[in-house]
């Protein structure tokens, strides 16, 4: 089956916004007008097509980015709907990485909200061209021009209106197209019937003013238009469109449109703008990667004639077909049933079926081509961020960076039956989400799950219950402390049992020394002259490591210690591996008590981005959390504060920051190093732990 749509007529776009700007409703309307859905879903009724996980329908927020294909005016548009909540930034990062362009949706009343700033910065990082859509023009307090000002101030963007609204709040009834200088008035409720008329008197002046602003903005980016504009020559609609397209793709401007998706007004012009101004896969630079054999940089152009390469950007478990791997094909062709090479893992895999996804139903295809987004079934070893390619022309594409999880809670199954299912459920969920990690606490045997925030873990537990029918009890969030020593000591350990029959005899002298942070554990054997036979040395090492699993202060793991075995003795008959293990473990515990043991805590590298006016409050708050401020810089028109703060002090920070900055501050944090806990705080922790 040959390609249905030429590459130039393909658009891979994302719809990104702050929570509640009306992003999912906008996607719904797009699917309705492009003929993919026959009845529109409403988010507040819980029937929106893109929100197909049960939790999303209940909470009315989008958690995973569902990928959908639709058609408009002879173009294929692949849409990825992304979540707007800060705990799910991994979903946004991962979809932006594989998109060519995006629609940024803003609420006409709220304008540029905190998550819009975060998402905008992520899109800047991946250089994704955007058009902006000011939604909810029909609500109280809607102000289109105000949003444009906010985009300049808060995002440092260059927004250029290509439409102005006719009426606002409950009188909003249409838009003026500033390219054709015609009005589009909506007649029916579904917005399918619209009339093109002359511009109504009440908006004539503002339309003229913004037409001039549009021409000036375009002239600044295009030499030919500049000349025509200055000489007062006529600039055709076609010339304007071409110049706006070029400036948008080069990230010199962001065209701004308006509408009310819920009232079905302004959605078709938005679709036209996607086709007119956002890039096709041909318009973007060739994708770069490196050769797994030589390490040299290679690139692949977006073309079917190039060797095949694709990036796996999302894994999903589907109740009917099992594991779905979402792929962005950058070059070449992939046929269903063929073999591909996973260059990240150095493994060959067979692709069973290839699907084009609609939000919740799917269509099988024989092949996918450069520029396509699709889902594959049958890739068992592939995980998020892996490169798939032609084995004869291997390439590894730049993977995605995912932050380390920062919060962990203990979970336990409610019943014996839940226990078996829990392991499978956790493995599946960890496969899907690179920011979700599972581990076991060796002392308590508890299962710990770690993620990006409390909502993130809440939803994971919720999904375990619904999708895998596993009920679990959840503990409180906790910090992973460790223990170490501050001075060197020499210590003797003896384990002797000699009361009839075969006895036990182990005797060691150890020296314990502190090492620098992050050095781990070192074992040095200085036995000479065979005072302890060679075969017992590994047992001494094993005994020490066993004792290090649980420190003397509060049972936390011990790190950064060098242990030297320098003397001891043995018995011809009674010495054994077990005896030396026990002697070494006793010696280590004894020695650690004398070596000035201390508690270590994880220190996080925190970056807080806040508008200037909240800076004093936020810095004061960081200091009160035992934070050390490292530096500040201006980014756009926000202040960036960099600091090191103990993880123990960061619980609940998201909520505090939100209230201190009226929701405009955002922060990221990642683990940096371990550091000694101040004595007064260590005493409190030990008191709690040893109760």
Swiss-Prot record:
Ranges for domain tr-type G come to 8-282
In this chain, GTP is annotated as bound at 17-24, 81-85, 135-138
Source lineage: Bacteria, Bacillati, Bacillota, Bacillota incertae sedis, Caldicellulosiruptorales
Domain of life according to the entry: Bacteria
> Which SUPFAM superfamilies does this chain map to?
EF-G C-terminal domain-like, P-loop containing nucleoside triphosphate hydrolases, Ribosomal protein S5 domain 2-like, Translation proteins
One of its Pfam families is: EFG_IV
According to the UniProt entry, its GO molecular function terms are: GTP binding; GTPase activity; translation elongation factor activity
Q: Name one GO biological process term.
A: ribosome disassembly
- What is the protein's species of origin? Caldicellulosiruptor bescii (strain ATCC BAA-1888 / DSM 6725 / KCTC 15123 / Z-1320)
Q: Which NCBIfam families does the entry mention?
A: EF-G, PRK12740.1-3, PRK12740.1-5, PRK13351.1-1, small_GTP
Per the entry, what this protein does is: Catalyzes the GTP-dependent ribosomal translocation step during translation elongation. During this step, the ribosome changes from the pre-translocational (PRE) to the post-translocational (POST) state as the newly formed A-site-bound peptidyl-tRNA and P-site-bound deacylated tRNA move to the P and E sites, respectively. Catalyzes the coordinated movement of the two tRNA molecules, the mRNA and conformational changes in the ribosome.
Entry GO terms, CC: cytoplasm
UniProt protein name: Elongation factor G
Q: Which family does it belong to?
A: Belongs to the TRAFAC class translation factor GTPase superfamily. Classic translation factor GTPase family. EF-G/EF-2 subfamily.
Which keywords appear in this protein's UniProt record, sorted alphabetically? Answer: Cytoplasm, Elongation factor, GTP-binding, Nucleotide-binding, Protein biosynthesis
The entry's localization annotation reads: Cytoplasm
